[in-house]
Amino acid sequence: MYNKNLSFDLPDNIKFINPDPFFDINEILPKVSILISDYSSVVTDYLLIKKKVIFYLHDYEKYQKKIGLIDNFRKILPGREIKNYIELKREIKNKQFNNKRINQNIKLHMKKYYDVGYKDSSKKIFNFIKNI
């Protein structure tokens, strides 16, 4: 998460990532305990390592109108939804996360949307392309 305008002290274990055009997010994902994101596709990569996500959706209605999302987007979130800055601040300061519910949501989400197996991925892709 990067936001130079946060107006409260954060615990020492929370780090900001400075945006860099050559930065590879995948290098740090395994080191991250909890990801705070919005609608970014990085969440999909992060869920593969089965860790917790907080969705900071302060502009949901605006984003839904302008960009669009699937109808049940909020219902299938594999993590906690935060709707405003005050909730985000409280969530970060409390460091309290409903681990069982979130872990269960991650498992269900992964099974429903990404359950294709991780074994022999390169071989499967090669065979798929070969058979086109």
Model-derived regions, located:
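A short alpha-helix capping/helix-coil boundary motif
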Residues: 11, 21-23, 68, 102-105
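Short, flexible, glycine/charge-rich loop motifs used to bind or transfer phosphoryl groups or to couple energy/partner
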Residues: 4-9, 24-25, 44, 69-72
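A short, terminal or domain-edge coil/loop segment
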Residues: 11-12, 47-59, 108-117
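Catalytic donor nucleotide-activated moiety binding site of glycosyltransferases and closely related
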Residues: 1-20
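C-terminal amphipathic helix plus adjacent low-complexity
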Residues: 84-132
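Short, contiguous acidic/charged loop-to-helix segments that flank catalytic cores in large enzymes
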Residues: 17-24, 76-79, 113-116
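Nucleotide-sugar donor-binding patch of glycosyltransferase catalytic domains
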Residues: 8, 48-99
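A donor-sugar binding/catalytic signature common to diverse glycosyltransferases
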Residues: 22-66
